[in-house]
């Protein structure tokens, strides 16, 4: 996957990219390895890291490093989803603050999509997120800290 993306980086942005893979499933080992390489690179594009490790790894690297860190699975997907919503609003003559959005899924990409969509002006109460169990609502006790930031209303109000 990253070899192809490296070609796109070069073709469309004239950015030289190198595909590096680390043989570890430990978040702290991964973070330390990437941080050690910082002086050699102008940016880091993370790929195929599952939640919740992707949130921890990306935030830790952003905090510790002086170069951009981008998790493609989260933010690349969110950018495309946001562009689609902006275009849909333009085509239907709606204001983004008036639309209601349902996000079906609650993985890293879905959470990043919801966060970006809200930052564009969709009110928190107009966004509903569902995972494999159902609607993520305020007070639901089986969600992690990232999912728990997403609910808009108590379940009984739905």
Q: What are the roles of these predicted feature ranges?
A:
Residues 1-13, 65, 79-158:
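Glycine-rich phosphate/diphosphate-binding loop of Rossmann-like nucleotide-binding domains
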Residues 1-67:
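N-terminal ligand-binding/catalytic initiation module
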Residues 18-20, 70, 128-130:
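Hydrophobic/aromatic beta-strand patches that form the interior of the parallel beta-sheet core
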Residues 22-23, 48-51, 72-75, 132-134:
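Short, ordered loop/turn segments at secondary-structure junctions
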Residues 40, 46, 69-70, 120-126:
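A glycine-rich helix N-cap at a beta->alpha junction
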Residues 47-54, 75-76, 106-111:
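Gly/Ser/Thr-rich loops at beta-strand to alpha-helix junctions
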Residues 55, 59-63, 67-80, 91:
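Flexible, Lys/Arg-rich cytosolic regulatory linkers and terminal tails that connect or flank
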């Amino acid at each position: 996957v990253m070899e192809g993306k490296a070609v796109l980086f070069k073709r469309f942005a004239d950015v030289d990219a190198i595909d590096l893979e680390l043989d570890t499933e430990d978040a702290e080992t991964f973070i330390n390895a990437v941080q050690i390489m910082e002086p050699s690179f102008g940016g880091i594009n993370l790929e195929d890291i599952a939640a919740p490790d992707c949130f921890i790894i990306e935030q830790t690297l952003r905090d510790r490093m002086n170069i951009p860190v981008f998790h493609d699975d989260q933010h690349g997907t969110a950018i495309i989803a946001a562009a689609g919503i902006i275009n849909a609003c333009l085509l239907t003559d709606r204001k983004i603050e008036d639309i209601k959005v349902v996000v079906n899924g609650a993985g890293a990409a879905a959470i990043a999509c919801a966060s970006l969509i809200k930052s564009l002006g969709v009110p928190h109460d107009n966004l509903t997120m569902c995972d494999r169990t159902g609607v993520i609502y305020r007070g639901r006790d089986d969600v992690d800290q990232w999912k728990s930031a997403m609910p808009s209303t108590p379940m009984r109000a739905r």
